[in-house]
């Protein structure tokens, strides 16, 4: 029977020292593959990464094509807010929280601004329970035979007991709840990453990825992180959904990717003359 997931409310019982500061899990990182920085070709609605001479669209661009953001619907549902300001603040907060978690997991010194601690502290309390950190911001660039390639970067790969788990950080505004039925896009994103990481790093990981977890941090004091996990048969279903979507995307955009590949090859030739 397929595994079904409800948002698990994980109460915080942090792994701490006498200082009261959350201590990160043991850091035993895998060696990442070399992938270029992302760039956006002119007049394209997708970004590209390059690895080994091959270009590949980023996962978030593919998902953005499948799940276009409906700003008009958002404005109708929340008419009394400054939508542009909320968007800017959300992006700023997300960048700050991701950077803080990245530095913390690697035990690098970093002092986030105080206003973001209400999201950072609960995430650190939860993630500190993991057995090991295997990767932070791990790059991926993966080709599916007969379909096409895709690329991206995953927030973290953790060992939780004997399970290899992908994690992705999300931050919510005050008063916002999380429902798994509205996490389709994010679950597909991690399903794509799980397929790629299990293949690309199979010789370095203790096992294939068996679970993906979306970690939604809330700013309300004392409110636990909401975890939406996908595993077992449900993860297999989402992996297949991703492969189907990837095929659909390449049917529409495959010629454009081929054109950009040719451009890249030509530029590479010119640079080596």
Positions of predicted regions on the chain:
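General "foldedness" signal
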Residues: 109-115, 226-228, 263
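Accessory terminal regions of nucleic-acid processing enzymes
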Residues: 1-2, 17, 143-146, 205, ...
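Mg2+/Mn2+-dependent nuclease catalytic core
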Residues: 138-253
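Amphipathic alpha-helical interaction segments
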Residues: 47, 106, 112, 127, ...
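Polar/charged alpha-helical tracts
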Residues: 28, 88, 107, 118, ...
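Metal-dependent nuclease catalytic cores that hydrolyze phosphodiester bonds in DNA/RNA
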Residues: 2-151, 270-273
């Amino acid at each position: 029977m397929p595994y079904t997931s409800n948002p698990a409310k994980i109460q915080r019982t942090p792994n701490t020292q006498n200082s009261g500061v959350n201590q990160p899990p043991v850091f035993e990182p895998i060696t990442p593959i070399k992938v270029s920085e992302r760039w956006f070709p002119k007049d394209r609605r997708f970004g590209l990464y390059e690895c080994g001479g091959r270009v590949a669209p980023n996962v978030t661009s593919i998902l953005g094509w499948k799940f276009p953001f409906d700003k008009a619907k958002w404005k109708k549902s929340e008419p009394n807010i400054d939508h542009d300001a909320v968007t800017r603040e959300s992006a700023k907060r997300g960048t700050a929280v991701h950077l803080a978690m990245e530095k913390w997991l690697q035990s690098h010194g970093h002092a986030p601004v105080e206003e973001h601690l209400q999201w950072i502290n609960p995430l650190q309390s939860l993630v500190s329970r993991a057995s090991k950190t295997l990767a932070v911001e791990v790059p991926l660039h993966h080709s599916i035979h007969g379909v096409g390639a895709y690329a991206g970067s995953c927030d973290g790969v953790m060992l939780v007991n004997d399970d290899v788990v992908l994690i992705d950080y999300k931050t919510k505004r005050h008063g916002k709840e999380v429902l798994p039925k509205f996490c389709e896009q994010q679950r597909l994103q991690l399903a794509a990453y799980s397929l790629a990481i299990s293949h690309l790093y199979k010789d370095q990981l203790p096992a294939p990825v068996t679970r993906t977890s979306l970690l939604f941090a809330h700013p309300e004091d004392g409110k636990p992180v909401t975890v939406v996990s996908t595993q077992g048969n449900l993860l297999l279903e989402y992996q297949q959904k991703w492969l189907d979507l990837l095929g659909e995307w390449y049917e529409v955009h495959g010629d454009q990717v081929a054109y950009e590949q040719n451009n890249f090859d030509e530029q590479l030739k010119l640079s080596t003359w």
